[in-house]
């Protein structure tokens, strides 16, 4: 098992460790801190977990997953186009609006939460649909909001 500070490379190892401790047949699965859901997704691919209960102390994260799962097309169109830029001003405007509406569980809050995390990810090494640094044809990484197709595909998990 890895240490308390988890790097993205360790998620697969953690999933393997957890998977080896689980029985072959699982009736219920509870994930107390789902975070990026990397561990749950990897486990689900291996075990086909029935009736998963996903939780996290971050209410905005739970709202985000709720809207992606239940209304992926509407969620994709929720952000205001003016806030889709990658400028410092756009990020500051998003943060200000988020502070005004946080903990209300609205689709707008969830969309802004995702956008803020995408913009903040510019400084990290995250990859994948909600880590959002995508590979281009030339080894460059670019930051993009997930496409509507990606959000709909992710919602089918």
Residue ranges of predicted features:
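Conserved S-adenosyl-L-methionine
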Residues: 11-14, 21-84
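SAM-dependent nucleic-acid methyltransferase catalytic core
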Residues: 1-15, 24, 71-157
């Amino acid at each position: 098992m890895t240490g308390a500070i988890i790097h993205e490379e360790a998620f697969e190892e953690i999933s393997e460790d957890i998977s080896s401790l689980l029985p072959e047949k699982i009736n219920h699965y509870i994930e107390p801190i789902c975070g990026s859901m990397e561990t749950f997704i990897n486990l689900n691919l291996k075990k086909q977990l029935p009736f998963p209960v996903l939780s996290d102390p971050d209410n905005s994260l739970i709202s985000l997953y709720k809207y992606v799962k239940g209304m992926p097309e509407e969620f994709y169109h929720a952000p205001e186009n003016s806030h889709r830029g990658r400028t410092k001003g756009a990020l500051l405007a998003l943060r200000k609006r988020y502070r005004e509406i946080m903990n209300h569980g609205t689709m707008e809050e969830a969309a802004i939460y995702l956008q803020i995390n995408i913009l903040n990810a510019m400084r990290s090494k995250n990859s994948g649909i909600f880590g959002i640094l995508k590979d281009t044809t030339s080894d460059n990484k670019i930051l993009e909001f997930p496409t509507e197709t990606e959000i709909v595909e992710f919602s089918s998990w």
